């Protein structure tokens, strides 16, 4: 094999390796956009959760201090739960902010968010089409 053909193979391998994290970030047609994994959102402000969703049904967002999933594959919603609305092809959810010390957006730490689509038509036995869990920090 010539050096020129080896460089083509190497470039192709790099492109494929770079594409795989994006593929892994989508589950059941739900792709989280922001906050991104391991991002830090400012304490005392409400972030906007954004996701791209393929398929019909309502889209909901859960925020939890734990990444543990229940039997349906979704995390708890103890910190926040809300219905996302579609704006320009992207679903968005901005939690209501409460200005007291114990509120989660005023409590620095690690949190997890997950979007899921509710679609029960067509004989689907599991109505919750959950997306990937994303770890982020409030700080």
Question: Language-model segments: what does each one mean?
Answer:
Residues 47-55:
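Aromatic/hydrophobic beta-strand junction motif of beta-rich domains
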Residues 23-48, 139:
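Short, compositionally biased P/S/T/A/G/V-rich stretches that sit at domain boundaries
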Residues 121-131:
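Beta-sandwich strand segments
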Residues 89-108:
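Signal that preferentially marks extracellular ectodomain short beta-strand elements
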Residues 73-90:
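Solvent-exposed serine/threonine-rich low-complexity stretches and specific carbohydrate-binding patches
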Residues 60-64:
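Beta-strand signatures of extracellular beta-sandwich domains
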Residues 9-18:
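Bacterial N-terminal signal peptides
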